[in-house]
UniProtKB/Swiss-Prot annotation:
The chain crosses the membrane at residues 16-36. InterPro entries: Modulator_MzrA, SecD-TM. GO terms for molecular function: protein kinase binding. This is Modulator protein MzrA.
Length: 130
């Protein structure tokens, strides 16, 4: 009786396996860019209490005048985060901003963990990708 049931439903299981396999492969393909994206960014913070952040438009104009393309500038947790298309542009912008802003501000590379953060939230052990 059990053998007859298994034999009768075997083609349906094979079909569902062949349907599930492309769905999983497509899902993995769609998730790859999000998992391995390296967002190049700088974060500017005031080095002393009471100092205000530089104007984002002023920073944009200064970096654009130097030929540095900026993807976005956003305020984020008492800092200014500037995103770039490439690591080279980020390093060039860091040099320009260190001269421009002198010692009033801390300039550091900003590592965005949002792409892999969801993996760390569902896992017992933190993951490091890349």
């Amino acid at each position: 009786m059990i053998a007859a049931f298994i034999k009768r439903h075997a083609p349906q299981r094979r079909l569902s396996l062949w349907l599930a396999l492309p769905v999983v492969a497509l899902l993995a393909l769609v998730m790859m860019p999000a998992l391995f994206r390296h967002d190049s960014a700088l974060q500017i913070r005031a080095s002393r209490q009471g100092a205000s952040l530089p104007d984002g438009f002023y920073v944009y104009q200064t970096l654009s005048a130097q030929g540095i393309h900026i993807k976005s500038i956003t305020p984020e947790q008492n800092s200014l985060v500037i995103r770039f298309d490439s690591q080279e542009q980020s390093y060039a912008a860091e040099r320009v901003l260190r001269e421009l802003l002198a010692q009033d501000f801390d300039i550091a590379h900003h590592h965005n963990q949002s792409a892999t953060g969801w993996i760390n939230r569902i896992s017992f052990k933190p993951q490091s990708i890349g």
